[in-house]
């Protein structure tokens, strides 16, 4: 699973996920991409589950790029603990996703195979996505 090797600070504020993605909004590495049109958070487990679904479908052909990285820690308190007494420990890492962000890219496969692989991957993600092609303008 993806997570930072080390961070400057262990915990972060929750923050607000607003605006549209300006960086990482174009397909830059592969020929096909999976773009988010919804807003939300992707955990490292969800990112990995989608990657596995794509990899299994395209078998040996093609190459996949993961364009997002979970760098925001989400803390949580243990079960049955009273409120207060400080912030909980970091439990997992998430990537904040704005609409327009390209999540995955693929190359070296035909369009039908890429579409089906991205459809399987999108089923693992908690937001709406759309299939994009590089030369048609992402």
From Swiss-Prot:
Keywords: Ribonucleoprotein, Ribosomal protein, RNA-binding, rRNA-binding, tRNA-binding. One of its GO terms (cellular component) is cytosolic large ribosomal subunit. Residues 1-20 are annotated as: Disordered. Residues 7-16 have a biased composition (Basic residues). GO terms for molecular function: rRNA binding; structural constituent of ribosome; tRNA binding. InterPro entries: Ribosomal_uL16, Ribosomal_uL16_bact-type, Ribosomal_uL16_CS, Ribosomal_uL16_dom, Ribosomal_uL16_sf. One of its GO terms (biological process) is translation. The keyword Ribonucleoprotein applies. Gene3D superfamilies: Ribosomal protein L10e/L16. Part of the 50S ribosomal subunit. PANTHER family: 50S/60S RIBOSOMAL PROTEIN L16, LARGE RIBOSOMAL SUBUNIT PROTEIN UL16M. Binds 23S rRNA and is also seen to make contacts with the A and possibly P site tRNAs. Belongs to the universal ribosomal protein uL16 family. This is Large ribosomal subunit protein uL16. It comes from Nitrosomonas eutropha (strain DSM 101675 / C91 / Nm57). The gene is rplP.
